[in-house]
């Protein structure tokens, strides 16, 4: 399944030409996760620890957002919000089925590189954040929405549900 992916980070402008996501950053790939430090290997109860939330990482083409992201990483600038949006590509009724909203965002790394055989240079960017909200929209076989979104939210700083 082909998908369209975009990220909007504060006032940083990208080069997306998409009608709905104009001037956002086109995302080629992304990853994010979390782990729990609890242990079920010994003792009688098996306790849970504090969740370890990873930085969100994404790959993009080098574009006009690049110098701004580099400056934000260098200076430690914080953005109030970043939003990663993913939808199925093509068709008339494109449903944005996964939206990840980050709050209190810091650009934690920018890694640029390439080789002579590539058409366009790419870079990897990682974002650190204090709070996350995930909205997943189930879809029917025909692509229509199937009910409302399923949500997850966590305040990382306070280690509580958001």
Curated annotation (Swiss-Prot):
<dbReference type="InterPro" id="IPR008514">
    <property type="entry name" value="T6SS_Hcp"/>
</dbReference>
<dbReference type="InterPro" id="IPR036624">
    <property type="entry name" value="Hcp1-lik_sf"/>
</dbReference>
<comment type="subunit">
    <text>Hexamer. Three hcp1 monomers form two closely related hexameric rings with a 40 Angstrom internal diameter.</text>
</comment>
<comment type="similarity">
    <text>Belongs to the hcp1 family.</text>
</comment>
<comment type="function">
    <text>Required for assembly of the protein secretion apparatus HSI-I. Actively secreted during chronic infection of cystic fibrosis patients.</text>
</comment>
<dbReference type="Pfam" id="PF05638">
    <property type="entry name" value="T6SS_HCP"/>
</dbReference>
<dbReference type="InterPro" id="IPR053165">
    <property type="entry name" value="HSI-I_assembly_Hcp1"/>
</dbReference>
<dbReference type="GO" id="GO:0042802">
    <property type="term" value="F:identical protein binding"/>
</dbReference>
<keyword id="KW-0964">Secreted</keyword>
<protein>
    <recommendedName>
        <fullName>Protein hcp1</fullName>
    </recommendedName>
</protein>
<dbReference type="GO" id="GO:0005576">
    <property type="term" value="C:extracellular region"/>
</dbReference>
């Amino acid at each position: 399944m082909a998908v369209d992916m975009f990220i909007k980070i504060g006032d940083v402008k990208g080069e997306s030409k998409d009608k709905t996501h104009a001037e956002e950053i086109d995302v080629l790939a992304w990853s994010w996760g979390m782990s729990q430090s609890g242990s079920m290997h010994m003792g009688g109860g098996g306790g849970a620890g504090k969740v370890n939330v990873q930085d969100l990482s994404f790959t993009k083409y080098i574009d006009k957002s690049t110098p701004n992201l580099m400056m934000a990483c260098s200076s430690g600038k914080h953005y109030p919000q970043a939003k990663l949006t993913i939808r199925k590509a093509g068709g008339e009724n494109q449903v944005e089925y996964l939206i990840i909203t980050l709050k209190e965002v810091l650009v934690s790394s920018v890694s640029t590189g390439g080789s002579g055989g590539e058409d366009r240079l790419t870079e990897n960017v990682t974002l650190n954040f204090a709070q996350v909200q995930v909205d997943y929209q189930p879809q029917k076989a025909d692509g229509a929405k199937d009910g409302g979104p399923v949500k997850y939210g966590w305040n990382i700083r306070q280690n509580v549900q958001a």
